[in-house]
Amino acid sequence: MIIVTGGAGFIGSNIVKALNELGRTDILVVDNLKDGTKFANLVDLDIADYCDKEDFIASIIAGDDLGDIEVIFHEGACSATTEWDGKYIMHNNYEYSKELLHYCLDREIPFFYASSAATYGDKTEFREEREFEAPLNVYGYSKFLFDQYVRAILPEANSPVCGFRYFNVYGPRENHKGAMASVAFHLNNQILKGEKPKLFAGSEHFRRDFVYVGDVAAVNIWCWQNNISGIYNLGTGNAESFLEVAKAVVKFHGKTEADIEIIPFPEHLKSRYQEYTQANLDKLRATGYDKPFKTVAQGVAEYMAWLNRK
């Protein structure tokens, strides 16, 4: 059996999809469906069972025998960088992850988990080393602290433990994320409502490492199949501007850059906004992973076709 926590969420459901494409359906999805809209991410996927995240962690803490577990992909977390309830974040992201990690270590179950580029804060170099890590929010701190915890235990681990620092992930199955969904998702919605797609002033200068969710799932699967351990950046290694994203969206809809409306940048975001991210992929490439990543033009075109499918 394969377990995917956050399996009804954005990245988790895409990992389930990738597993289905390998012919695997013996999958236990763990999630919190309080937001019932997330069920839509699982409708076209084949899984064996579903478990609520609180019931699942209770079983983990109790040391219950959950059967023969081949691997756990731990994608479940509060991923809102705007959430400032530190007690909630640390319990949900840090403590939960530690319990799951130790369950896996004790039973030598491979453990692959979601970290985040938020661990770097506003640094301008993005390498998986302590000197480049300075998170700006409690979400980033929860991910950073768990990475530090993993670093300390890795030398003693007898089974793979692997964390991925996701950069700006976009693509299918993020509809439930609301304000935290990608820029491409929001621009598409604006166009469908008959509005002009809106970008913040200066968006041509805000450059991020936008990575397509299908590529993210592919790296997770490959690292599992190749018994990779460590903490790795997962982006494309190439920063592109928000304007490039917008241009790819409007192109799909038969519009041009002239159709984009520029709006003022919100004051409250200025001190907490990463202007630039670009994953250094040296460490990931050193594992032997050599597949290319989709560019914004390629990935957004594929995503728009999926979002606007009839």
UniProtKB/Swiss-Prot annotation:
Substrate binds at N168, A179, H186, F200, A201, G202, S203, R208, Y273. The active site is at Y139 (proton acceptor), K177 (proton acceptor). GO terms for biological process: ADP-L-glycero-beta-D-manno-heptose biosynthetic process; lipopolysaccharide core region biosynthetic process. It comes from the Bacteria. Belongs to the NAD(P)-dependent epimerase/dehydratase family. HldD subfamily. Contains a large N-terminal NADP-binding domain, and a smaller C-terminal substrate-binding domain. This is ADP-L-glycero-D-manno-heptose-6-epimerase. It comes from Pasteurella multocida (strain Pm70). The gene is hldD.
